Amino acid sequence: MSDFIFTSESVTEGHPDKICDQISDAVLDALLTEDPESRVACETVVNTGLCLLTGEITSKAKVDYIKLVRNVIKEIGYEGYRAGGFDANSCAVLVALDEQSPDISQGVNYADDVNDDLEDNTGAGDQGIMFGYACDETPELMPLPISLAHRLAIQLAKVRHEEVLNYLLPDGKTQVSIDYEKGLPVSINTILISTQHNPEIDGITNEEEIRQRIKEDLWTHVVIPATEDLKIKPNISKTRFLVNPTGKFVVGGPQGDAGLTGRKIIVDTYGGYARHGGGAFSGKDPTKVDRSAAYAARYVAKSIVKAKLAKKAEVQLSYAIGVAKPISILVETFDTGVISQANLTELIKEHFDLRPAAIIKEFNLRNLPKKMGGNFFRKTASYGHFGRRDLQLPWENVEEKAAKLEEASKIFL
């Protein structure tokens, strides 16, 4: 199918599930900052007036979890009259954390394929499959639908924080539908923005008048700035623009819906444009291959596309708990590759070390939280883990690796 419409969504940092992702990753940052060897599997639940922190943690670090949780909620914007019914200062915070199972830790500490190579000694923290993807639709080598959805969500949060639109509240979602012809993006079919807001705007209380005001403001202050540097731009007369289709969005955040860590895995990755192994990222230390190997798979896929060995690349990795080396490596280029997929797989095995300890070392994952002032993984917990123009993420830095791949591939041309 070469002509189609593809749709992806994003959510703001005030979405209930994203509150949870950010809290879980803030806990991870705090623990790794004090103890880089911390083992963390932290889950968060939010609901009306409640935040529950649970999971398994083994660490020498001492963290004031209640204070940390309240600070994250406050920084997102849920405080006082701007809280929209959920307040960092008054919500109950419950902490129910255990230590990591010794049966799991022994497999991570002492890999099944242990030998004299130290990086063979750290086994994968669980079994599983992970996918990485890249394509040449955008400068950051991401699919256009999810890239644009994130741009809109980031700009929506920005105009709220800066009080350009002072009636906005923290919860919000974006969705973008792109027209494709012959497999290439050609136009923006539909933009949908749902944003929480005050019940009254500058004296306006009529529901339809409020929605029209928000729609006009969002086009001017969110859509236009978020897309001004794109080759494909929205057209006010052709692009369908939907805002708060139910009519109003006053009750939101945890007051409106419960939130859980790990429920926005498609938002976190490629917007449904590529396959997903099912594992969430947030709240997991780097020994969990759900996270670290997914970063590595993106690194491999992006390197392939950057080296112009394919226009699209999807990489699947699989692991067994307690075993260092991947069980399997698969690359798919969707008939866009300049060399065979078998040759690409050979290059991957030669140029990428995909053992958990090697991935952790390559990206410095244990030490980045301290290096970044205690705030690294939390920044990835909203607006996507890949293709971030606003963050310096090591798995996105592929210039050197792509150059090596390009040179090495010449023997197959």
Curated annotation (Swiss-Prot):
It is an enzyme of class 2 (transferase). It comes from the Bacteria. GO terms for molecular function: ATP binding; magnesium ion binding; methionine adenosyltransferase activity. L-methionine binds at E56, Q100, D257, K288. SUPFAM superfamilies: S-adenosylmethionine synthetase. The keyword NADP does not apply. Keywords: ATP-binding, Cytoplasm, Magnesium, Metal-binding, Nucleotide-binding, One-carbon metabolism, Potassium, Transferase. Pathway: Amino-acid biosynthesis; S-adenosyl-L-methionine biosynthesis; S-adenosyl-L-methionine from L-methionine: step 1/1. PROSITE patterns: ADOMET_SYNTHASE_1, ADOMET_SYNTHASE_2. Its EC number is 2.5.1.6. K(+) binds at E43. It is found in: Cytoplasm. It catalyses: L-methionine + ATP + H2O = S-adenosyl-L-methionine + phosphate + diphosphate. Binds 2 divalent ions per subunit. Binds 1 potassium ion per subunit. Its cofactor is Mg(2+); K(+). The keyword Protease does not apply. Residues 100-110 are annotated as: Flexible loop. GO terms for biological process: one-carbon metabolic process; S-adenosylmethionine biosynthetic process. One of its GO terms (cellular component) is cytoplasm. ATP binds at H15, D171, G172, K173, K248, F249, D257, R263, K264, A280, K284. Mg(2+) binds at D17. Gene3D superfamilies: 3.30.300.10. Belongs to the AdoMet synthase family. Catalyzes the formation of S-adenosylmethionine (AdoMet) from methionine and ATP. The overall synthetic reaction is composed of two sequential steps, AdoMet formation and the subsequent tripolyphosphate hydrolysis which occurs prior to release of AdoMet from the enzyme. Homotetramer; dimer of dimers. This is S-adenosylmethionine synthase.
